[in-house]
Amino acid sequence: MQNLKSLVKPLGLVLFTAIFAASNAVANLPESVKTLLNGYEFRNVSVSPSGKYISLIMKEDERGTLVILNRSTMQVEESIRYEDDDNIEVSGGSWVSENLYKYRVLTEYSEGRRPGDFGDQFIFNMETRKNTRIWNYRGTYLNKALRSGKKIYGRLDILSYLPEDDSNILVAVSPFKRDGGVRPMVYKLELSTGDLARVMNGPARGASMLTNETAGTIVASAPTEDFTTEFFFRRTGDTEWTDIDINLPGRFTGLNVSDDGQLVYGLTQVEEGPNAPRLLVSIALDSGVMETVHDFGFVAEISVEFGEGGHPSYATWIADEPKIRIFEKDLVSTVVAGFMKSFKGFNVSLTSVDDSEENMVFHVGSPGVSGEYYIW
């Protein structure tokens, strides 16, 4: 692993290079909007919850590199790159908390074969500058530091960053099995050590899970052999999973659980056929009542953002051109709509926003074009 501070000193000049001439529409943007990064060189740009740091993944000598900048000065604070001998390279990540950044790596498991994402993950601490591997696709022990206890294998998915617990995150581990696997297991993962503490079994084979903001409610959906979806939920204090009484005639992609733990939102298709419209729906956990929030029609690249109370704020999608539907008008949805008007015909996506909504990062692009990042 190599620190790249010396290699990316010119980065500041790149960041401050204005490219407003790239689009006549940019002149309509407020002065607080600045071109941040050139999309051909950088990706996975995000701002930390406090707004203090900006992170990105860049290519340096064909190696994926994590770079963390100070938001105020736009100077490089830290960077991480792995060399060829390490057999891994940084692929992407996100902020866990104000000072913790979790990132994934691609693993070269066989010489001459393209590196793959097997779920290997690291945590980098901006306070201590400590880099900790928290997950390895070959498996890890329940007590990682002492290499004791049962060894756990599989794919690790983050369920919740546990806003009231700075030391742990909630994760689900799905064992690697050719036939679809066994039920996933839910653990608490200690960020400083990578140690795992078992919480509960998942409700069904192949189940995917979501939590509300506090992780007080977990909702799971699992595919069945007849191509339908079954649903379950479990709240803090429950000793077992509860079936949700609903017969959904198709696949369901869960998106969010409301903060009060009463509703789960997701995308589905209830009609048959390859051109069936896609729906944003809500499902009441206790009654199983499903309501359609929005019918998108037969479209692509649907993205739904959630706001106050964990309910939909706005959605964007691609039909004959990029479109937006605002469900609850707030600062974020207003800024996104403004960007879409300024960049008519381009895909606009919000990639990150800090807790105070004072810093928002946007990507503006189109099919076949990497595009550009902007910070508002």
Where are these regions (language model features)?
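Beta-propeller folds
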Residues: 27-360, 365-371
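Pre-Walker A segment
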Residues: 372-376
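Bacterial N-terminal signal peptides that target proteins for export
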Residues: 2-12
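Bacterial N-terminal signal peptides
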Residues: 12-21
